[in-house]
Curated annotation (Swiss-Prot):
This is Large ribosomal subunit protein uL10. Forms part of the ribosomal stalk, playing a central role in the interaction of the ribosome with GTP-bound translation factors. Keywords: Ribonucleoprotein, Ribosomal protein, RNA-binding, rRNA-binding. GO terms for molecular function: large ribosomal subunit rRNA binding; structural constituent of ribosome. The lineage of its organism: Bacteria, Bacillati, Bacillota, Clostridia, Eubacteriales. The gene is rplJ. The keyword Ribosomal protein applies. GO terms for cellular component: large ribosomal subunit. GO terms for biological process: translation. CDD domains: Ribosomal_L10. Part of the ribosomal stalk of the 50S ribosomal subunit. The N-terminus interacts with L11 and the large rRNA to form the base of the stalk. The C-terminus forms an elongated spine to which L12 dimers bind in a sequential fashion forming a multimeric L10(L12)X complex. Belongs to the universal ribosomal protein uL10 family. Disulfide bonds: none annotated.
Length: 179
């Protein structure tokens, strides 16, 4: 195994820390982005809790290997930009896709991703980007739970109302018989 220079060891340590702390990572190939585009992308990603880094493929490979992340090597070619999502798993993929949907020609090609320590291919990253955010998913689950409960409550309410109407009718009938 090759020895790594101290400055490279520091870069590997930073990559390892980011890989460990991130909920997901998107690896992308940025083809000819301007400085203004990169700055704007970084700003938008930062607002979503995503950090954008450019790193050497060999250092990414070393950091991944040391963390036990396997299967990343085939995707480590060209210029690799990493988007580390620290809050929402889908935020990085979603924001990158949204940002480049505005461009006429895509200059950012998603290569792969890392989700829960497992490597996913570009199609997996795109599927991750298509997922609704956490709040929307929770709302959908709660709506799914709430709907049957509302149906049961409505049925019980209907039975009670029918019983009340029948009881009221019987009271009127008895009052009419006494008079």
């Amino acid at each position: 195994m090759r020895t790594i220079r101290p400055e490279k060891q520091q870069a590997v340590a930073e990559l390892k820390e980011a890989l460990q702390n991130a909920k997901s990572v998107v690896l992308a190939d940025n083809l000819g982005l301007t400085v203004a585009q990169v700055t704007q992308l970084r700003r938008e990603l930062r607002q979503a809790g995503v950090e954008l880094k450019v790193a050497k493929n060999t250092l990414i490979g070393i950091a991944a290997r040391e963390l036990g992340i396997e299967g990343l090597e085939p995707y480590l070619h060209g210029t690799t930009t990493l988007a580390f999502s620290y809050e929402d798993e889908a935020a990085g993929a979603k924001k990158i896709r949204e940002f480049f949907a505005k461009e006429r020609e895509p200059k950012f090609v998603m290569k792969a991703g890392i989700l829960e320590g497992k490597v996913i291919d570009a199609d997996g990253v795109k599927a991750l980007a298509d997922l609704p955010n956490r709040e929307t998913l929770l709302a959908q689950v709660l709506a799914g739970i709430q709907a049957p409960l509302q149906g049961v409550a409505g049925a019980i309410n209907g039975l009670l109302a029918s019983f009340a109407y029948a009881l009221d009718a019987r009271i009127r009938q008895l009052e009419g018989a006494e008079a």
